[in-house]
Amino acid sequence: HLGVGQRYNARFEGGSNEFRWSTDLQYKDTEGAMKGSSRKNFNGGITLLYKFKTLTFRNYTSIGINHSDESNYGSFSDYVRMQPYNTPYDKNGVLRMFLEPFSAIEDGIENPLYNAALNTINSKDYKMLTNNFSVDWNILPYLTMRGQLGVSNTVSTSDYFLPAEHTYFSSPNRNGEYDTPEGYMRRGLYRYGNTESTTFNADVTLAFNKIFAERHSLYAGVNWSLLTSKSDGFNIALEGFANSDAPKIANARQHATNIMPSGNNSTRHQFGVTGNVNYTYNSRYYLDLSYRVDGNSMYGSKEKYSSFWSTGLGWNVHQEDFIKNIKELNMLRLK
């Protein structure tokens, strides 16, 4: 089987000097080398921009959807183990559950073609929705302020189902676990996982940038940022599906034996303030200073805040007259 794919892209835009809009659409469908395996991706986004005097408003909304299916014919390694004398059908043309071993002391190999004819499920889904809104304010030619607010939500799910007729429950590797009267009632397995996370972030930046007396360049900026995120997830395994044509969680007989449900829940809050100062003299020498204070709920109750600072000096040697005449050298900087 040869895996092929297709991909489509589209972009539309329009508007006026004050108001602009654009939208992007992408779709990609890829088939795997194994029959039945595929990856489908869709991404879309829309951007809105509006200018009013010294204010610029922007909003970007995007959505991403991914769906993947694994082949019900098994993995490539299942076929690597096959021998030329293995036949998937018996003399009556019926699919074998297990391929005949070479000798009596060997166990039969599970027939992937037999399992492919069953109603198995092995898929994953992922969805992400994001919205970012920002405002730029040109207070003065050398003084600007920018505010941004963002929110994103992601949901991922996984489904894995083996019907009662699957060779998994009759394999010698199970040591007869599903061959007892109670074991027969437990045949059929469904694993389901779900994780959802939501993130909010906001930040405000005030920036000053001006040149004095044609030689002195000064930049100073302050940024305030806030982030909060929450994540919830769980995984369950159920067994005992009498009807293979109705692989629904509600049709399970019980929770899977020896497989406990699991879950996780986490919440994080973060706050930070950053200050930066940069001074440059005649495009030759410069000084950088920065300081940041971080507050994070992950730090613990005793030390909720931490601070960082840095400083740096630099010399743009390529701006010196004795270097400008060297054509082979266009940049040389010492820090």
Functional labels for PLM-detected ranges:
Residues G14-S16, L48-F52, V135-W137, F208-K210, ...:
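Residue-level signature of outer-membrane beta-barrel architecture
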Residues R7-D29, A33, N43-K51, R58-Y60, ...:
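Predominantly transmembrane beta-strands of Gram-negative outer membrane beta-barrel pores used
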Residues N201, Q270-N276, R284-Y286:
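Short glycine-rich loop/turn motifs
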Residues L25-E31, L287-N296:
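Transmembrane beta-strand segments that form the barrel wall of outer-membrane beta-barrel proteins
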Residues H1-K35, N72-S75, N115-N119, D136-N138:
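Residues embedded in well-ordered regular secondary structure
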Residues N9, R20-D24, T56-Y60, S134, ...:
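Membrane-spanning beta-strand positions in outer-membrane beta-barrel proteins
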Residues H1, G32-M34, N43-T130, R146-Q148, ...:
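Surface-exposed loop/interface segments of Gram-negative outer-membrane beta-barrel transport/assembly proteins
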